[in-house]
């Protein structure tokens, strides 16, 4: 950690697109007469499969946009009808967050208490529990390919999924790319993201490709084009697997962590949360939220609370649910504890 660190109708649409493609491919082959009068069969025109797929995706996206305009969201969307409260970390690490720092049973008891506090603080909005697991983690060592990141083992991922299912919680898989990039890392999670209860987080702090530095030495950055890649990646999974919308979380605690935010292109198949990720005293945290989230809105907002770092110096304290609900505008729909 850097010391300054203070997402039915779509299925029908897909079938329509597939049917149109099938009809085109099954048309009789045209023929023409040769100079001798015999028929010469023309070879079938080559099909640009990538173009066809893009057209189908565009058709599906337009259908999604139409539904969203009429109803405000797609069927099965979690936001804004819930407040997500998450425990963050890695079950194999005591140093990455509350998820993994304490024995499982002890952590789950604490989680139940936190969930109850949030539900009591705002009875009007149901609380959705979540585990937010760092699944691809930035590393201090380069690794075999020099990219400074490591993916959790399958057994770790499956155990984390099991923990989430025990709590009827959704699961976020968080990605720290190091010197790699999203196009190389996100496809590794495709099979997991086909699960409707699994969502995605991306962390610009550890995106170092444009910084030419090892993770932890500088604060990394993403541009709108990187966020758009993640949105499109998730939207494709939603469409191809007939899923409810996915949630994408983008962490942020400095101006430079996200550039050109106005160029982010929202898609109704993906619900985007900008998560204010800094630690420190409540005044600093609220100021950072105002500067980097409230003043640069994208869609939905999130706020992180640190069990250790927010109380590091007296009289600092861990903000209560009531404080978060009454002192932040817009009120976060995602609250994360690390």
State the predicted function of each range.
Residues 217-335:
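Surface-exposed substrate-engagement region within the catalytic domains
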Residues 20-23:
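C-terminal motif of bacterial Sec signal peptides marking the signal peptidase cleavage site
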Residues 71-133:
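Catalytic domains of carbohydrate-active enzymes, especially glycoside hydrolases
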Residues 2-11:
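Bacterial N-terminal signal peptides that target proteins for export
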Residues 84-86, 126-132, 170-172, 197-201, ...:
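Structural preference for beta-strand elements that scaffold enzyme active sites
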Residues 25-27:
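Bacterial signal peptide processing site
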Residues 117-119, 126-205:
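Substrate-binding cleft of extracellular glycoside hydrolase catalytic domains
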């Amino acid at each position: 950690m850097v010391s300054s660190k203070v997402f039915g109708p779509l299925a029908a649409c897909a079938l329509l697109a597939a049917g149109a493609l099938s009809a085109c491919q099954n048309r009789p082959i045209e023929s023409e007469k040769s100079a001798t009068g015999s028929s010469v069969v023309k070879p079938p025109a080559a099909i640009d499969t990538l173009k066809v797929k893009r057209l189908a995706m565009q058709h599906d996206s337009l259908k999604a946009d139409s539904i969203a305009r009429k109803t405000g969201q797609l069927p099965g969307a979690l936001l804004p009808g819930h407040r997500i409260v998450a425990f963050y970390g890695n079950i194999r690490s005591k140093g990455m967050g509350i998820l993994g720092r304490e024995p499982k049973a002890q952590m789950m008891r604490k989680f139940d208490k936190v969930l109850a506090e949030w539900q009591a603080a705002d009875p009007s909005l149901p609380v959705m529990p979540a585990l937010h697991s760092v699944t691809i983690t930035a590393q201090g060592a380069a690794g075999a390919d020099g990219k400074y990141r490591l993916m959790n083992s399958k057994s770790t991922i499956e155990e984390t999924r099991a923990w989430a299912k025990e709590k009827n919680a959704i699961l976020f898989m968080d990605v720290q790319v190091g010197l790699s990039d999203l196009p190389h890392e996100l496809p590794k999670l495709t099979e997991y993201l086909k699960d409707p209860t699994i969502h995605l987080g991306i962390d610009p702090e550890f995106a170092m490709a444009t910084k030419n530095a090892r993770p932890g030495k500088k604060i990394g950055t993403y541009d709108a084009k990187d966020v758009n890649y993640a949105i499109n990646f998730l939207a494709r999974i939603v469409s191809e697997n007939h899923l409810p919308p996915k949630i994408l979380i983008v962490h942020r605690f400095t101006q430079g962590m996200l550039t050109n935010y106005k160029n982010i292109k929202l898609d109704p198949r993906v619900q985007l949360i900008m998560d204010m990720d800094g630690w420190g005293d409540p005044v600093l945290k609220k100021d950072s939220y105002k500067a980097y989230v409230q003043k640069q809105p994208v869609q939905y907002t999130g706020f992180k609370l640190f069990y250790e770092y927010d109380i590091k110096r007296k009289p600092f304290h861990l903000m209560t649910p009531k404080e978060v609900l009454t002192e932040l505008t817009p009120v976060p729909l995602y609250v994360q504890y690390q």
